[in-house]
Amino acid sequence: MNYTLIEPTQRARSVVEQVLLNRGLDADKIARYIEPTEDEAFDPHLLDNIIHAAKTLLLAIMNQKKIYVQIDSDCDGYTSSALLLNYLHRLFPSTVENNIAYGLHSKKHHGINIDDIPLDTQLVVVPDASSNEVEFHKQLFENGIMCIILDHHHAEVDRTDPAIIVNNQMCSYPNKALSGVGIVYKFCCVLDEIMRTSYADGYLDLVAVGMIADMMDMRELETRYLTVEGLKDIRNPFILELAKKNEYKIKDEFNPFTISWYVAPFINAVTRSGTMEEKQLLFKSMLEYEAYRLVPSTKRGCSGSEELLVEQSVRTCGNVKSRQEKEKKNTLDIIYNAIQEQNSNASNVLIIQLEQSLDNNLNGLLANHIMGEFGKPTLILTKRDKDGVITWEGSARGYQTKEVEDWRQFIMDSGYCMYAEGHPFAFGVGFTPENLEDFKRYINKRFEEKIEKNYKVDFIWTDKNTLDDDIINLASYRHLWGQEVGEPLVMLQFTFKEENVALLGKGTLKLSIPGTKTTCIQFGYGEEEYFNLRTLFAQGEGLNIQIVGYCRINEWNGNCSPQIEIKDFSVERIVGYDF
């Protein structure tokens, strides 16, 4: 097992200071990161075109023009549009209910769907998308329809574009880590100024959820501030109801971790795999003026009764998530067969080619699952035939190693792919058939040995005397971690006797560190793996084990004890020793 200490620990620093410095924060920003204030927020007027956009929208409302809002198909898109419509409903309830229509994508698609725009529309508003759709903007403009774009995606400035574009990537706005919902919030702040109201801050919960789901960099202090403020006061009916259903897991603790695991995935499941009816139900449940309406119950055994729309929505989201997991399981069987038939596992990078098309919405989830199961960088590619031109395209997932710091860039630099777009370790990729075969040969030559993960750890702990306190201390700061400020990873090295090791129910490995209250657990540990581990004890008096993992506080029957959630471990040597 390979690991690297990010920076030597300095005694003058607290563990939190050390971690935040390791994440690239300047020393003078650490206190501001931990407790951000409104001083971190930038003036919304720094966004180009924001006044023009606000006045254009208000003028359309005052003149009772028909307005269409295009909802983008991900969590950031849904929260962006929900924020805008909820805010406008506070100001102009009759206008929103009578003159503003909105549209959802039937499939996972981004940008304007011109065919869905009602014929009497005079203004189109697109939160979280469409900055690069110049031709659509021109087409609408020629038909007398103006566009307001409230977006954060990269696009080139085109002076011929008739749309009013508010985009932090296309101007000198200092914070590039605001997602679409952040831009909509800034837009509503300007509307507040014009209308002399103060409604925008009431929707910061949607801002927080959207930015967390869209993986915005929390090292940007404005982004951190808006997220912290939003999570302090959850008001949105859908988020509240979903939290109630997941209260055992969330435990009233709203932070980037709980939002990422127990809120955003349910929204994304519906946007990816839901029917149009399910998507409409979800979005309506995010609207304050729709969520608490009584609707005919769809609950089993409750025919003829009514229930709140938001309750129905949350239950439906759970059903869609379960359906998605079932579909994922069925598709995994196809992938396992392909791995066996193609002997893909013989290579140290899994390249899996599937003749039949998969649900594009599941590609990334499947690649991530296979990478985790096989412990190898993974590409899942499906055959595409466009007008007789064959390509292999799909999703790639990787992890940091000593040789490769960025898998997307590595594949791009190989010169064999048509494209590799996305994040360093999660991205879309495409090849021609000829170049794919060349890429396979290149990979096999480059990585003759198994590609070992290289864990970058914040601390190396070997002192039993301080271990319990160190773990409890670091675990108590869980609310501070987020995108680009990842949860600290620690490395422990201790010697274990056979009685310190146990396999609990449901495949949970438990290692109890002698002389401490600390236990280390790993989920999904197989009986065969456990048998092999136990046999090593027969060769000596104990095992010296290195463990890489995350700090946790185990709460049971009112008692709290330090715990390490194991990410990986290795037996360094068999030893003879005296406890």
Give short role names for the model-derived ranges.
Residues 2-123, 142-145, 192-441, 459-464, ...:
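Hydrophobic helix-and-loop "lid/oligomerization" segment in the mid-to-C-terminal part
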Residues 231-240, 245, 448-534:
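A contiguous loop/helix-start segment that scaffolds small-molecule binding in enzyme catalytic cores
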Residues 109, 114-117, 124-141, 145-207, ...:
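Conserved phosphate-handling catalytic cores of large alpha/beta enzymes
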Residues 555-578:
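OB-fold/S1-family single-stranded nucleic acid-binding modules
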Residues 420-421, 496-497, 542-555:
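OB-fold and OB-like beta-barrel modules that bind single-stranded nucleic acids
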Residues 266, 512-514, 548-550, 567:
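Residue-level recognition of well-ordered beta-strand positions that form the cores
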Residues 528-548:
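Short nucleic-acid-contacting surface segments enriched for D/E, G, S/T with interspersed K/R
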